[in-house]
Amino acid sequence: MENYQKIEKIGEGTYGVVYKARELTHPNRIVALKKIRLEAEDEGVPSTAIREISLLKEMNDPNIVRLLNIVHADGHKLYLVFEFLDLDLKKYMEALPVSEGGRGRALPDGSTLSRNLGLGDAMVKKFMAQLIEGIRFCHSHRVLHRDLKPQNLLIDRDGNLKLADFGLARAFGVPLRTYTHEVVTLWYRSPEILLGGRQYSTGVDMWSCGAIFAEMCTRKPLFPGDSEIDEIFKIFRILGTPDETIWPGVTSFPDFKPTFPKWKREDIQNVVPGLEEDGLDLLEALLEYDPARRISAKQACMHPYFQHGSSYYSGRARRNGFH
């Protein structure tokens, strides 16, 4: 760790403390140091985790927070060195004026982002394009996120959104609680995971993307459950209780109960008022119960909501087209 000088603690992530630090070999480079707290501290870092994380260093995409380095210290400590961004989507939404559905909170100290960016329709579309393109890139490399939420969507000084923590779930698992014993949020978790499914795929990230989309539009979480069953019921109350006709195989999930209340589906237009028709169509495609029919990131990039293609709105057209 001699190459890094910690400046301050900036947060407590799912896996451990996050520091703002200076890279001493490049004195002008500020980085985020994520200290990964491993379950079995005495056993050292599992080689599988090191392998998984090493693969993430190769993930280079403008929509992904860049993993710059992996530092293995004292045998059982692991630090991940990421590019530094001081703002996340949760804080960004909270900083919006109360008149725009935010809480008028101050941006983090030293945040260089202009306060007047707001979160109007065009900004939501841009953030969605960047989010979906980032997910598409990761899925094309067979990497899932599994824990997408506004807290790990970071925003740079130019008002561009980048995905953080991609691939960490596979390396370290998704804990039920953070290392400080805070409960990991369930608000963005897909129904197949909540119902105890063991086999899941890229659709889990697309569901999270839908919940985040709705929250950007309304400034309120769509399914703010405070336990697994409350989360399931919050979903059922809005989207209706699924059955075999809507979601073939749903009754076979380990945690599905035939005694679940039978709620009718709400009109999505009433849930997210003001969202344009193509946006509502994309939202419904993201919040499709059946993961086999849920829209993929690749399909979402070409959805009519992004009339000119997602790269037009993300502002991040790639030289060599899509991966």
From Swiss-Prot:
Q: Quote the cellular component terms of the Gene Ontology held in the record.
A: cyclin-dependent protein kinase holoenzyme complex; cytoplasm; nucleus; spindle pole body
Name the gene that codes for it. Answer: nimX
Molecular function terms in GO for this entry?
A: ATP binding; cyclin binding; cyclin-dependent protein serine/threonine kinase activity; protein serine kinase activity
The UniProt family comment states: Belongs to the protein kinase superfamily. CMGC Ser/Thr protein kinase family. CDC2/CDKX subfamily.
Active-site residues, as the UniProt record annotates them: D147 (proton acceptor)
Q: Which residues does the annotation say bind ATP?
A: I10, G11, E12, G13, T14, Y15, G16, V17, V18, K34
Pfam families given in the database record: Pkinase
Q: What is this protein called?
A: Cyclin-dependent kinase 1
On assembly, the entry states: Forms a stable but non-covalent complex with a regulatory subunit (SUC1) and with a cyclin.
Name of the top EC class for this enzyme: transferase
Species? Emericella nidulans (strain FGSC A4 / ATCC 38163 / CBS 112.46 / NRRL 194 / M139) (Aspergillus nidulans)
Instruction: Give a GO biological-process term.
Output: positive regulation of mitotic cell cycle phase transition
The yes or no answer to whether the keyword Transferase is present is yes
Which residues get modified to Phosphothreonine?
Answer: T14, T180
Keywords attached to this entry: ATP-binding, Cell cycle, Cell division, Kinase, Mitosis, Nucleotide-binding, Phosphoprotein, Serine/threonine-protein kinase, Transferase
Q: Which reaction does it catalyse?
A: L-seryl-[protein] + ATP = O-phospho-L-seryl-[protein] + ADP + H(+); L-threonyl-[protein] + ATP = O-phospho-L-threonyl-[protein] + ADP + H(+)
Task: List residues modified as Phosphotyrosine.
Answer: Y15
Q: Which residues belong to any copy of the Protein kinase domain?
A: 4-306
* Activity control summary: Phosphorylation at Thr-14 or Tyr-15 inactivates the enzyme, while phosphorylation at Thr-180 activates it.
Its domain of life reads: Eukaryota
Q: What is its EC number?
A: 2.7.11.22
- The secretion signal range is none
What this protein is reported to do is described as: Cyclin-dependent kinase that acts as a master regulator of the mitotic and meiotic cell cycles.
